[in-house]
């Protein structure tokens, strides 16, 4: 290895802290062990290299084989001499270190040569179909390795929707961000046969942070390297939020890819934890029960499924309050999970972010987001089971299309998740209503004929910590 090559290698090595270097060295020694021991038997001082077979053997359980092959091709694409664009036969330690350095600590320009070769082993532009296959493999690998390493933080493949559809939906969403050289977005199905050069892919990786984050997860968790060191996983620490409150055999309307995508659009301070407040499967099909479980619980994600199978919802940035006025702020958004995955943010046209009303004769009663009275982007009627998503052509508040299969839909299931930490006003410590603490006070009220106005709209606070 010449001086220039040696200097480049040392520069990449210097990006790693001493304990990280030790981690990377140990991993390469493990991966190259079989080939080096064979060389030692022959009495030859051969340079250690890694083979595809060794990498496959190491990654057999943590990662799908297609992704292992892609990683190996990425490693082989590192040109140590600067003279050849061909893939090497084996992977040398210098290639391995530079590969890890570029993907984990590099910018979009440093990552792009590797990613191009992970997409296709042939040099030059890549087809849309090849990018789609790479993206689907990448998302599938993230779901697989997080499940395998038990890093889904309370979510499981059993308590969420089947991820197969979610993988395709998230892949399509990320691919929709591909921009051609003239700045226009490629449209399916033409996208599949189109060719994209290095500059387009580099721009895509730069603008779509999920690609780098997913590669980081696959490397750290797949190779089991640099995954436990402090400050090295900031980009992926809240990729999946902690899950609280799923009990029994409840299966969420979310799948793992959609949880990852929706969570990435929440304010950063809310991304670390989701807590199930209401599920129609668990708490029954009742609007008063819905209100009782979600009022004054902090920011929430609402998700519902209509009887045609469409899944969609919205993020409420403030605690829900029962009142005949709009509430919330411009951090609110609507989203679709199935048949397509997308997020629709505010337009600035109006401030009709979120609305919750119950028991009034002169104003609409129900839960709504976006649009206007009787013409909401998302509406769940207080006559539980009915709803609408009106958007001709788009919801004025969020620029969302019709989210349900039919404009007026029938509700099949509904969930509400509190996101982030519970607000102090909703915490149980010293905050119980006198009616919860003192049953005699409740009885006295009833004896004197006083009605409990909060009955049905206020959830009795349980003694156990339901946050665990």
Swiss-Prot record:
GO terms for biological process: positive regulation of protein localization to lysosome; regulation of cell migration; regulation of cell population proliferation; response to amino acid; response to insulin; response to nutrient levels; response to oxidative stress; TOR signaling. It is found in: Membrane; Cytoplasm; Lysosome. InterPro entries: TLDc_dom. GO terms for cellular component: cytoplasm; lysosomal membrane; membrane; nucleus. It comes from the Eukaryota. Residues 252-420 form the TLDc domain. It comes from Gallus gallus. This is MTOR-associated protein MEAK7. Keywords: Cytoplasm, Lysosome, Membrane. The lineage of its organism: Eukaryota, Metazoa, Chordata, Craniata, Vertebrata. Residues 445-468 are annotated as: Disordered. Its main location: membrane. The gene is MEAK7. Activates an alternative mTOR signaling to regulate cell proliferation and migration.
């Amino acid at each position: 290895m010449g001086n220039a090559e040696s200097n480049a290698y040392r520069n990449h090595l210097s990006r790693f802290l001493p304990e990280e270097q030790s981690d990377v060295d140990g991993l390469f020694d493990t991966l190259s062990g079989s080939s080096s021991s064979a060389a030692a038997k022959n009495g030859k001082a051969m340079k250690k290299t890694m083979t595809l077979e060794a990498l496959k053997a190491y990654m057999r359980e943590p990662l799908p084989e297609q992704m292992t092959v892609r990683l190996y091709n990425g490693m082989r694409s590192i040109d140590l001499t600067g003279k050849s664009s061909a893939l090497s036969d084996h992977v040398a330690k210098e290639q391995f270190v530079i590969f890890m350095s570029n993907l984990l600590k590099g910018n979009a320009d440093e990552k792009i040569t590797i990613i191009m070769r992970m997409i296709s082993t042939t040099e030059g532009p890549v087809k849309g179909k090849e990018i789609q296959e790479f993206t689907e493999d990448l998302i599938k690998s993230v779901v697989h390795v997080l499940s395998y390493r038990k890093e889904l933080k309370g979510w499981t493949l059993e308590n969420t929707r089947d991820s197969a559809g979610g993988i395709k939906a998230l892949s399509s969403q990320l691919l929709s961000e591909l921009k051609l050289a003239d700045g226009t977005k490629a449209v399916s199905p033409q996208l599949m046969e189109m060719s994209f050069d290095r500059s387009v892919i580099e721009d895509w990786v730069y603008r779509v942070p999920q690609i780098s984050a997913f590669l980081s997860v696959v490397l750290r968790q797949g190779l089991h390297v640099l995954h436990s060191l402090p400050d090295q996983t900031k980009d992926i620490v809240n990729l999946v939020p902690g899950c609280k409150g799923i009990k029994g055999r409840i299966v969420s309307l979310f799948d793992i890819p959609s949880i990852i995508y929706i969570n990435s659009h929440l304010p950063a301070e809310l991304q670390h934890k989701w807590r199930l407040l209401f599920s129609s499967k668990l708490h029954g099909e009742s609007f008063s029960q819905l209100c009782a479980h979600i009022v004054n619980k902090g920011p929430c994600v609402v998700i519902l499924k209509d009887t045609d199978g469409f899944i969609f919802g919205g993020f409420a940035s403030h605690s829900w309050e029962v009142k005949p006025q709009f509430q919330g702020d411009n951090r609110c958004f609507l989203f679709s999970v199935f048949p397509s995955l997308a997020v629709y943010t505010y337009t600035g046209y109006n401030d009709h972010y979120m609305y919750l009303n119950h028991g009034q004769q002169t104003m609409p009663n129900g839960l709504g987001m976006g649009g206007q009275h009787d013409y909401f982007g998302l509406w769940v009627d207080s006559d539980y089971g009915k709803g609408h998503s009106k958007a001709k052509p788009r919801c004025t508040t969020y620029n969302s299309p019709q989210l349900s299969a039919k404009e007026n839909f029938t509700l099949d299931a509904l969930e509400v998740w509190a996101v982030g930490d519970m607000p102090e006003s909703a915490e149980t410590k010293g905050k119980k209503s006198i009616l919860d603490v003192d049953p005699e006070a409740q009885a006295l009220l009833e004896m004197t004929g006083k009605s409990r106005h909060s009955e049905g709209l206020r959830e009795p606070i349980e003694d156990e910590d339901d946050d665990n």
